[in-house]
Amino acid sequence: MTQPTLKIGLWNARGLTRGSEELRIFLSDHDIDVMLTTETHMRVGQRIYLPGYLMYHAHHPSGNSRGGSAVIIKSRLCHSPLTPISTNDRQIARVHLQTSVGTVTVAAVYLPPAERWIVDDFKSMFAALGNKFIAGGDYNAKHAWWGNPRSCPRGKMLQEVIAHGQYQVLATGEPTFYSYNPLLTPSALDFFITCGYGMGRLDVQTLQELSSDHLPILAVLHATPLKKPQRVRLLAHNADINIFKTHLEQLSEVNMQILEAVDIDNATSLFMSKLSEAAQLAAPRNRHEVEAFRPLQLPSSILALLRLKRRVRKEYARTGDPRMQQIHSRLANCLHKALARRKQAQIDTFLDNLGADASTNYSLWRITKRFKAQPTPKSAIKNPSGGWCRTSLEKTEVFANNLEQRFTPYNYAPESLCRQVEEYLESPFQMSLPLSAVTLEEVKNLIAKLPLKKAPGEDLLDNRTIRLLPDQALQFLALIFNSVLDVGYFPKAWKSASIIMIHKTGKTPTDVDSYRPTSLLPSLGKIMERLILNRLLTCKDVTKAIPKFQFGFRLQHGTPEQLHRVVNFALEAMENKEYAVGAFLDIQQAFDRVWHPGLLYKAKRLFPPQLYLVVKSFLEERTFHVSVDGYKSSIKPIAAGVPQGSVLGPTLYSVFASDMPTHTPVTEVDEEDVLIATYADDTAVLTKSKSILAATSGLQEYLDAFQQWAENWNVRINAEKCANVTFANRTGSCPGVSLNGRLIRHHQAYKYLGITLDRKLTFSRHITNIQQAFRTKVARMSWLIAPRNKLSLGCKVNIYKSILAPCLFYGLQVYGIAAKSHLNKIRILQAKTLRRISGAPWYMRTRDIERDLKVPKLGDKLQNIAQKYMERLNVHPNSLARKLGTAAVVNADPRTRVKRRLKRHHPHDLPNLVLT
């Protein structure tokens, strides 16, 4: 049995983008674990794709295509990137790699030749790498210790540092740099410097491969690199379904009485154990790990070129004949062109086979999904003490400790209210009717609607497996569900969340607060939550308690209706020569900090007793752990908040916020001159008056009442992120409003629910933002929609309609009232994109392109969207939304109807608007 090894390559690429395909062959042929590259000549944001590998860069500080280094590492290895060192005199990319002999820092080092180095510079550089490292790179230092006939000043300084014995040089003793200038002597510039490893553990050799004036070096460390644990599912994809179902049919023979909480936990445990047994019996007998890296299959012509180039390279290294160097350069160019043609042919074949239907397994949408989200490389995380997390396991603990603090309630509520809440929660219930029983048919209907592409929770039970359960298993499951409702106890196994952290775009990746938690909950628990929610929504007290101005988490409600309310209110103020003063409030960590006693206090007043007990059990004793690269943190408690990712969570938050202040506290203006608009935790409050002082006073009255409500229920408002906007055609702005003594910053425009609302509601800033976002998205999809590629025209049009166009038309039923000069910018974006997609010549008219591609013109699109929107408003379940529809406007009392003074459109005018 061969000893496990870690293979580390080193290469000065002189430009990595040109040699990426040849590097891919090199990585495959030698099964390289870590590749250290220098002189990558890559700009910030520039990427190359190497399947199965991750790349961490240290760019030149100028941002230009010069210098730079990169660590290319197998994605399945346990590693943690460190902050790169990027200055004019050094570019060092580094990662922490976990091996069987401990964690080692692997660094790619490039030291430009023009900079002067002294002994202290080398000492500080090595100190930054730690006590155990392997640093390979182009040091531009010559000395006899690593194979140079002559020494340079930098080489002498480096040799002086190494001579103390703490560091060792790992080199082949052969030249690695063969200049294109025949007058320059070959020299050894590329080598490794190690610390903390005995030389007996390391082997090194020079390879006559890759196209550059530097030869690659391969070092072998006799240690086993640790691999990330693989996340598996309970039932394998190629399992025998018949065996799985047959074994579960035995659940019909289980005779189990469930009378109390312990029985429910035992029944849940029994059900999962039976599922695990069935999955193991159904698993394929010859299960083996599929190797992720296979040698590339290359055509014979390219293999011949590779062999010939290597022979010529060896001959040139042996003889130094300039003619051999010229032949090698020509062969390298031929190889580069051949690899480029092969890559383009592969892309053409791939694009030609893409499709948007089931016959191609929806391959078009699979590939576009990969490019819709901006890729975020892994980053090092700072721990609370200011140091760096060296391993993925350390990351999990740092994230978990941070979340544990976040899942803790604030302490603002007065003691008198806390006592009142506590006393009420301990008071006895009133008599009520029993809940409707869960039937087998109800369970089947819920399971049939489960989405298949959802990650499983801690129990590894995914929705695909649940859909395969036989009736006997579903009957046992229905028994558990009914017991949960009868006993009023939510199983403990369904209250554990596995959390993964997702980086927030634009935030510092090294900060632990720059990551958003995403919870993976047990699927069976989610089904139980849906059953509870269905029964909650039939309670009239619950539906009445949630205010009408809350448009979030409600059926047949969306962001356009709430935006329409805000815009319509401001437009009416402008028509009446009034000021509309608005405050857009930011509730800090609204869902994570929900005060459980306060939520239960409100729930007990509204919910039937049995549902209240289940919800109470649902919130109590919840736990979580954080998962990073397959490693799990210790289990932490959740003391506050509604479970993120749960089915019940949104409705519970709506109940918690249901008693927030309405227009009642406002006395400075009339009731109809106050607008409250909430969508989930996004809250907007507007007041209007002919007097800017009266409108401001009315808004301040509401904010004072809202601040008092927030303190009573342990809610924190972040005044720094709140915004104050004045909507008016007149001069003058709100003199200022405050929250908890802090002045809210006044803005000329604010982005609310994805639409930028400016002072005069021209939507010019919003359309400018649309242009920027659309161009970015088009650039990301450019390789798919380019006119010369092999992707069919129909697929390109599908990409435009399904992925690109929604960026243009979101909220069109509201911002469509903008001036034609602004809307024309949207029309131009569509015209340019369609012309690019179709490859139409310059003389072809845009309207002909739109007709041939069956893409509606902007005016037709606007009318169609507005017409459907108005039809929906006319029959909307919410009376606040129905007031916005054309039917309500036409049938309104003429005495109360707003007189149209300004020459501008309102949203209900859009169905009849004609754009030329």
Swiss-Prot record:
<keyword id="KW-0548">Nucleotidyltransferase</keyword>
<keyword id="KW-0814">Transposable element</keyword>
<dbReference type="InterPro" id="IPR043502">
    <property type="entry name" value="DNA/RNA_pol_sf"/>
</dbReference>
<dbReference type="Pfam" id="PF03372">
    <property type="entry name" value="Exo_endo_phos"/>
</dbReference>
<keyword id="KW-0808">Transferase</keyword>
<dbReference type="InterPro" id="IPR005135">
    <property type="entry name" value="Endo/exonuclease/phosphatase"/>
</dbReference>
<keyword id="KW-0695">RNA-directed DNA polymerase</keyword>
<dbReference type="GO" id="GO:0003964">
    <property type="term" value="F:RNA-directed DNA polymerase activity"/>
</dbReference>
<protein>
    <recommendedName>
        <fullName>RNA-directed DNA polymerase from mobile element jockey</fullName>
        <ecNumber>2.7.7.49</ecNumber>
    </recommendedName>
</protein>
<dbReference type="Pfam" id="PF00078">
    <property type="entry name" value="RVT_1"/>
</dbReference>
<dbReference type="InterPro" id="IPR000477">
    <property type="entry name" value="RT_dom"/>
</dbReference>
<feature type="domain" description="Reverse transcriptase">
    <location>
        <begin position="483"/>
        <end position="757"/>
    </location>
</feature>
<dbReference type="InterPro" id="IPR052560">
    <property type="entry name" value="RdDP_mobile_element"/>
</dbReference>
<dbReference type="InterPro" id="IPR036691">
    <property type="entry name" value="Endo/exonu/phosph_ase_sf"/>
</dbReference>
